[in-house]
């Protein structure tokens, strides 16, 4: 028995073959013919107007790797696009820059409608547009996630100016979700001036009742100022954890769907105009241990906002807020700390119901209330909350302690180069 265990422990690790290619057709064939554990190297240089389709099947223990010869030096330009299909592929070190000429996504986790990517990973890559770059398309998206159990991590994504969400998770019968987006740097995106400019959207109205079970964690969103919804949740059972939002003129919005968790996120407005926090719509959400500081937004961009619902709402309307747990959050020096029962839609007449506020701390600005109410909430539970100011529009709550000397430790802005691809730091 000991001899058998020793043999297993010291068994040699078998490495796959490595093949270097310099054009899209050679890359396509190399990935198609690759065996689990093989590595395909894409030569450094300008891969202009390249439609690169990478379709292959590795295994969990031996994925097929497609990487840049030198991280960041294999650059796709012009009318290029990248598509992945199959399973257990890892793509790393590529730079998609100033792409134009195609209305299709820059990067898709599918070859076509019949061949999706599952259990694939794009890591240490960049998708960027220079400040002076003018795309020819009026509308497009940059990244589309399809299939299931894919990863997008340690990437830099910035500079989109045209209409269209930057990153979309698509859901459906063949696209159940369960994706993991982490350690990405979502850089500046200028104001669009209309809807359709989200940085990240998971689902849409039609798929909003699906359990997507996506995990979005430890990403940086910096100056993503495209529209009110920086992150737009439109599905159920997603988790947004430990992300950092710096000077974002928008919010993490639970727009459609139920049972999502928003926890341990950091929102730093740095007194930039219209910077926002968390907007809640729907049922059974949990807003836990978030820190929101120096935000200048109001209305939908309030630090934490609970929205009024529309009776018998359609899927793309406003469902009533029900049974939300708001616990352990800190709000420091925000223009508006918490807003209950708000909506700018006249037919939204259903107030939040069944909400539990527990162990939250609020330090409001001088002369500002801790909590503002537009439409009185129903059946709220208040436990061990503390604020330096009184609320407005609410009766006295034994579970909301007034402490004019309450202090909350402020957070400093983290280093921006701690996120994204290693070769861009």
Q: Where are each of the predicted segments found?
A:
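Positively charged n-region of N-terminal signal peptides that target proteins for export
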Residues: 1-4
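Hydrophobic h-region of N-terminal signal peptides that target proteins for export
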Residues: 7-16
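Short N-terminal segments immediately surrounding and downstream of signal-peptide cleavage
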Residues: 18-30
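Residues at the C-termini of beta-strands that transition into short coil/loop
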Residues: 22-25, 69-70, 80, 100
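Beta-solenoid repeat scaffold
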Residues: 32-75, 82-93, 115-120
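Glycine- and acidic/polar-rich repeat regions and solenoidal domains
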Residues: 51-53, 78-83, 97-120, 127-397
């Amino acid at each position: 028995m000991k001899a058998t265990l020793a043999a297993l422990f010291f068994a040699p690790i078998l490495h796959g073959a490595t093949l270097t290619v310099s054009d899209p057709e050679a890359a396509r064939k190399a990935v198609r013919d690759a065996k689990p554990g093989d590595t395909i190297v894409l030569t450094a240089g300008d891969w202009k107007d390249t439609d690169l389709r990478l379709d292959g099947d590795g295994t969990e223990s031996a994925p097929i790797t497609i990487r840049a010869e030198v991280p960041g030096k294999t650059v796709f330009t012009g009318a290029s696009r990248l598509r992945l299909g199959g399973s257990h592929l890892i793509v790393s070190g590529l730079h998609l820059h100033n792409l134009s000429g195609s209305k299709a996504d820059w990067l898709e986790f599918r070859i076509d409608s019949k061949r999706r990517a599952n259990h694939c990973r794009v890591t240490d890559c960049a998708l960027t547009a220079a400040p002076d770059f003018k795309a020819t398309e009026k509308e497009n998206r940059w990244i589309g996630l399809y299939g299931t159990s894919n990863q997008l991590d340690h990437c830099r994504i910035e500079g989109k100016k045209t209409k269209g969400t930057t990153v979309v998770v698509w859901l459906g019968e063949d696209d159940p979700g369960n994706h993991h987006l982490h350690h990405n740097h979502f850089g500046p995106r200028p104001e669009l001036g209309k809807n359709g400019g989200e940085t990240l959207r998971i689902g849409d109205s039609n798929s909003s009742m699906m359990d997507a079970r996506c995990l979005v964690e430890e990403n940086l969103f910096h100056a993503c100022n495209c529209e009110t919804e920086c992150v737009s949740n439109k599905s159920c059972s997603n988790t947004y954890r430990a992300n950092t939002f710096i000077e974002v003129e928008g919010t993490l919005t639970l727009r459609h769907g139920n049972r999502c968790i928003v926890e341990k996120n950091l929102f730093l407005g740095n007194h930039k105009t219209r910077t926002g926090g968390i907007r809640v719509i729907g049922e059974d959400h949990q807003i836990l241990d978030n820190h929101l500081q120096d935000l200048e937004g109001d209305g939908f961009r309030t630090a934490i906002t609970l929205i009024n619902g529309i009776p018998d709402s359609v899927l793309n309307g406003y469902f009533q807020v029900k049974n939300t747990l708001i616990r352990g959050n800190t709000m420091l020096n925000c223009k508006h700390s918490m807003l209950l029962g708000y909506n700018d839609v006249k037919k939204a007449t259903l107030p939040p119901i069944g909400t539990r506020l527990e162990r939250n701390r609020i330090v409001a600005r001088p002369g500002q209330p801790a909590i503002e109410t537009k439409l009185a909430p129903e059946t709220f539970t208040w436990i061990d909350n503390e604020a330096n100011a009184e609320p407005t529009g609410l009766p006295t709550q034994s579970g909301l302690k007034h402490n004019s000397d309450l202090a909350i430790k402020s957070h400093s802005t983290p280093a921006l180069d701690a996120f994204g691809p290693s070769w861009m730091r």
